Amino acid sequence: MVWDATNIFLFAANILTVLYILYNDAVIPLWKGKTVLSVKLRSRGRWDGYIFVGIIVLLFVSNTFFREGPFSTSVLLGIMGVLFIYICFFRSSKAVFKESGLFYALLFFPYAKIERMNLSEDGVLVIETNRQRLMLFARSEKDLEKMLAVFTTYS
């Protein structure tokens, strides 16, 4: 394996991507106590995923067939493509509700720090903390009712 700057960057990006997947799918459900509710949210930015995976595929094809680049770079690009296909198309964003707060976008927000909540007409639950605004795009009205029930019970 050739350890040039490109391969080091691709290797580090693949390791960080695997750590992200493990944290999101294995650590968050077990961390900060028992999971009260886990709700899958509507996906936003699906086209961003198509574009990003398309760029990785173009880099892979260019490196492998047209440039005849190092095999190790092709392998690392292939691994990155598989990881991002999983992230963009098979994994869905979710909000994980615990007894003391919720995980959203990899961060934990305690219920005590929530200042106000608003519900829009199109099913978006807007949660305002002292520093930021969270927008939870519920997939269905039942999911929205479940989220509101958890908020009324635990906050």
Curated annotation (Swiss-Prot):
Subcellular location(s) of the protein: Cell membrane
Family: Belongs to the UPF0266 family.
NCBIfam families with a match to the protein in the record: PRK02913.1 (NF002791)
Main location: membrane
GO cellular component, one term: plasma membrane
Keywords: Cell membrane, Membrane, Transmembrane, Transmembrane helix
Protein name per Swiss-Prot or TrEMBL: UPF0266 membrane protein lmo0779
Transmembrane segments: 8-28, 46-66, 70-90
Source taxon at top rank: Bacteria
Recorded topology in the membrane: Multi-pass membrane protein
